[in-house]
UniProtKB/Swiss-Prot annotation:
Transmembrane segments: none annotated. Residues 242-251 have a biased composition (Low complexity). It is found in: Mitochondrion. Probable phospholipase that hydrolyzes phosphatidic acid. Residues 161-180, 242-268, 311-340 are annotated as: Disordered. It comes from the Eukaryota. GO terms for cellular component: cytoplasm; mitochondrial matrix; mitochondrion. This is Probable phospholipase YOR022C, mitochondrial. Residues 311-324 have a biased composition (Polar residues). Residues 1-22 form a transit peptide. Its EC number is 3.1.1.-. Residues 519-700 form the DDHD domain. It comes from Saccharomyces cerevisiae (strain ATCC 204508 / S288c) (Baker's yeast).
Amino acid sequence: MLRFTHRGLPSSTRFRNIFVRLNHIYVPWFYAIDVPNSKPYLPTYQTLHSPKKFKPFSVDDSNRLEKASKRQERRPVLVNEDYLFKVDLSHMELSPTYWEGPTYQVRRGVWFDSSNQPLSSDLTSEIEGLYKQLKFDDSNDDPTTTPPAESQDIFRLKGKYPVDKENEGEQKNGSSNKDENESTFKFILFANKQTAFLLSDLDGGKLQLAFLRSNLAQSLPINATMITRSYKYSSSATTKQTSTSFKAAKTPQTEVADGSNSSKSRSIETKLEKKVSNLFNLSDFLQLFNGNASKDQDDAQSLEKQMETDYNNADNSQGANASSKIEDGKNSGASDRQIRSNRRDVDNLILCVHGIGQTLGKKYEYVNFAHTVNLLRSNMKKIYNNSEKLQSLNTAPDYKSNCNVQVLPITWRHSISFQTDAKEENIENPDLPTLSQVTVNGVLPLRKLLADGLLDILLYVEPYYQDMILQQVTSQLNKTYRIFKEFNPEFDGKVHLVGHSLGSMILFDILSKQKKYELEFQVDNLFFIGSPIGLLKLIQRTKIGDRPEFPNDLERKLTVQRPQCKDIYNVYHVCDPISYRMEPLVSKEMAHYEQTYLPHCSEAYGLTSKVLEFGENIWKDLPGTDENNLQSKKTSPEKKEVKLSENLTRMLTGLNYTGRLDYAMSPSLLEVDFISAIKSHVSYFEEPDIAAFILKEILSKHENASEIYVKRKTG
């Protein structure tokens, strides 16, 4: 028995009508990933050629873009993972929602070339206008239907549309030597309801046109470019482009025939060399020392890698896997399963502030803080989805699939133009030279790298620049928070801050001076990662706490600071030369005790887990080492724990509910210090252990510890 609704139609009929109507309006939309329209802070940037690589938006995003386009809405349309990106329909551009980043061309997918890429908006618009003149029978869904006999099937194009060359260099160099008529499409011939051909000339006459009208031309187009009014996704394309950075590490090594120690040692050396090379993957980092690292080609390749990961972190397979035939706006590939929103509920907002080295982003595209924060967000989601323990800490209704945490970058350095920047003239003091003019020429690439990376610390020590930095970061924090609230008006959760390197010092000072640098939100957890706070506050004769530890601290002219937040964490790698402890600044007694160690995440798949596995494997292969020796190292007696006094416990729990501020990443069995020192300071945001720790602390309920046990240092 059919159940009728208030509109007088059976509910099942209404559902079918709604779904058909949804199919009818569905048109896939795409965004470029290879050539940016613009780059932030590079006003001189110009595109040399049109983008050739496009990725599809999800079905939900495409539907909303299509509706907004028809309504001619001026407000940006939020798209992709967590709506972290937006589309400006007036300029057909995709850009980040909350931070500065490259903008990319957006296209409405109606006509596609032989590479399955959407044609440009201008060309598509003109072709569609001509296509409608053919007046195909809407009731006939056969794509091979030819134009009516009385209709004209070939038209001259009004616009100037360049012929795409596979070899960009050939196009660029050859354009000046060829006639304009040879380098642009002038005509279009419609072969059937789904296929057409673009031609630059009609030199072949009637014979060429007759061939293009035949079915054979679709398999072997001659002197023409075939385009189709359909889009088909091949899942193998994504697989081929997938990066396999650790593939070489899995290659079986040649077995050593004899069992001598010397042969085994040589095998170990070979294994060590190859595994270290693959493990740390320093090729990109070492390019910083290469004078050619800032070449346009290198920048384009690295930016394309970031684009494919950052702008496409969401499960866009729902849009990509939809094989769509566009016939008068109809789509046969969309399904109700694919039509879902990228929006998710967020109860915890994390804002990350970068530190030293971010000026490198102006010169080397692959040193990009927004990219590393996107990796942190991605790691958090992957680890959360695989961890029942983390899910059990989440009280949200959708805890199974949503960690309810959002992570956004705060990129402040590019917004400040210091007079000490390498080649910028000193406007305030024109008699002073630029930084490049006082730089010694010896080992120039290394000097430039160190200047770009370490100069910000020297700038921060100077009061004038320090105030400029604090004002700018405060402004960026408030701006990002306001934008987030604008697009997420229902958000009423907690805000947490993460500071990396100098960024941690900046956050420490902002939260310690809230009357001068006021934030528009309360801070819950404050994470310092790879932080030099311990050193800089020691130089400033500043202790950390709510009040002086001893009454005569004030008489000794010691400053005591306490950031306005609930809990403070100081996380670092033992090999990081920039990091320093903070607990001894709370009480000198803590200098006699070890820091606590970051728990190793069993779901981790990054550098830490690979180092641990690698060190254990190498240890087993060492001559004279057996399983019993290795096991004895694991089961060696632990150091005896000492209980802290009530006064010290109260002081520490006033800064962190656990009573511990310093958290070191677990050391591996095999430390390669010279490599670790280079890599450790810049790879925190890529570490799954860091992502898991931040997630755990944010989702956990905090109750102050009544007792604190520590381990005394040895030696």
